[in-house]
Regions:
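C-terminal functional extensions of proteins
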Residues: 275-278, 296-299, 307-309
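Terminal amphipathic alpha-helical/low-complexity segments used for targeting or macromolecular assembly
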Residues: 1-175, 300-309
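Short gly/ser/thr-rich secondary-structure transition/capping motifs
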Residues: 173-185, 228-233
Length: 309
């Protein structure tokens, strides 16, 4: 069989499969947001958030105003087009079709207006990473080299769009960061200031997770939901845990369930599995085969329990 016959045969088989196998086709539907365009926009947004760090050429203070204006203008047009596609695919309740273009413009402007606030909280994440990792040489190294910073920056951007009920785009953004960093931060998660995940790889933060300020986690931590038969029926419910302020969670710990609260100032040891709430200032560890929950105040004169890895 020559190449022409092979292509013809495969074309017929694939087209037949499109009719036979549904659910993974998107034919005759709305024009979906472009994954390639969104990843390019996300990179440009990182350039705005961290000027001089994600650029190929030096950025000079004498030119920063003009360069920022030009980059904002470019992002505005591209992002507005992708948001319009997302609204056409999944319009918010009560939004008539004729107002989608205007709504996309307004949402894009509102999103961009939040960038200064996002920068302020990202600065606290950089500080948390630098102060929380003795291996960090400088803040420059943290921003340039640590995959966590890119992942949390993208999550905080995507969260703004998630709050505005923009479909598809927030998840495309965070899954791109997931692919690059190895850390899965859902755009719906509420994450406080001074957040740091050391080593990053394998950490999962689910959609309805709530994380307070000054929380530090390590690789392989999972803030996850219970796997229940109800499935999609649980979509609007709180399914993931709440982590209060100044909690440290060591590598491999799994914390599960929407009613689970880890109290302020607690330390969660490595590889523990938690499905129940923990009181503030607790230490949760394995003692042999048994998990123990201890009061950290009772151990204040004993060995240090917060380690660096």
């Amino acid at each position: 069989m020559d190449s022409v016959e092979t292509v013809t045969k495969l074309t017929n088989e694939l087209v037949a499969s499109y009719a036979r196998v549904g659910g993974i086709n998107h034919l005759d539907g709305k024009n979906l947001p472009s994954k390639r365009a969104i990843t390019a926009i996300t990179m440009d947004l990182l350039r705005l958030l961290f000027p001089g760090y994600f650029d190929e050429q030096p950025v000079h203070s004498s030119e920063i105003r003009a360069e920022t204006a030009a980059l904002l203008d470019a992002i505005l047009g591209k992002l507005e087009d992708e948001i319009r596609k997302a609204l056409e695919y999944s319009p918010p309740d009560g939004l008539p079709k004729k107002k989608i273009t205007a709504a996309a413009h307004s949402l894009t402007l509102e999103f961009l207006e939040n960038l200064p606030r996002v920068r302020e909280i990202l600065q606290t994440d950089v500080e948390a990473a630098f102060n929380g990792d003795p291996a960090a040489i400088s803040r420059e190294e943290v921003i340039v080299a640590y995959p966590f910073i890119e992942a949390i920056a993208v999550q905080r951007l995507a969260h703004e769009l998630y709050l505005k009920n923009v479909a598809l785009i927030p998840r495309i953004m965070t899954e791109w960061a997931h692919f690059r960093s190895g850390m899965d931060l859902h755009p719906g998660a509420q994450i406080g200031s001074h957040f740091f995940v050391d080593h990053c790889t394998g950490t999962v933060v689910g959609e309805t997770s709530i994380i307070g300020d000054h929380v530090k986690m390590y690789q392989g931590v999972g803030l996850v939901a219970k796997s229940l038969a109800a499935g999609q029926a649980l979509r609007a419910q709180k399914r993931h845990p709440t982590i209060e302020d100044r909690v440290t969670i060591y590598a491999g710990a799994t914390i599960m369930g929407g009613e689970t609260v880890i109290g302020e100032g607690s330390t969660i040891g490595g590889n523990v599995f938690i499905m129940d709430s923990v009181a503030p200032h607790s230490l949760v560890i394995y003692d042999g085969l048994d998990m123990r929950v201890l009061n950290k105040a009772d151990r204040k004169n004993k060995a240090v329990v917060d380690f660096q890895i």
